[in-house]
């Protein structure tokens, strides 16, 4: 049946908290009209105003959970006279990644994106790995199937955060003795609000966002479990930027592989040759 399908309403409680703390960036006010009569009424973006939490409950790994990046947009699609399908949603790509886990004087493990690091691509897709090029296919997209006789008004939203595990012991060692001394992470992302005609592959960029997540955790492996790790600056993250001028989407952000499938875990000892610990899933 012609119509539109989306499950798109963000958490009102979270949005109310962020508004109260002055953390939501918004372009609310005058609606913006794009090609094909697509109207963006409002775009909001924020990073939750809470510090990264650290979990030392495991004797094998340290876990941490960063605050969430959140974005939402209210969009109006005009009537679609033809038998065609439009998808409106979020596309995200990683443009910079540094992710090091230091093990004292022995060396460090490092999650790396080789093509990005070597400058072969501008950015790498951060799709869920199934619904390329979209970040996801639940609240992150809305599909409108024509013909339709009236406006379709909807909200699409997305969120992202990091929740990894880092081994206390050197990852290439048979020893289980804790040696982890520091975790450092710095990643930058570009997030686009996009409308695509699936019949013609016409793509319209409606909004561009920039955001960054930075993390530094100091670890004393000689202390008892539960007392080893301490979050260092920055405690609070910089809020996302909603750009006044849209940026084009690099071709590499629209296709396989995504960042999760392309990343490789390296062991880089202080002395000796680097070693691949976990190869990329996509070759």
Curated annotation (Swiss-Prot):
InterPro entries: FAM78. Belongs to the FAM78 family. This is Protein FAM78A. It comes from Homo sapiens. The gene is FAM78A.
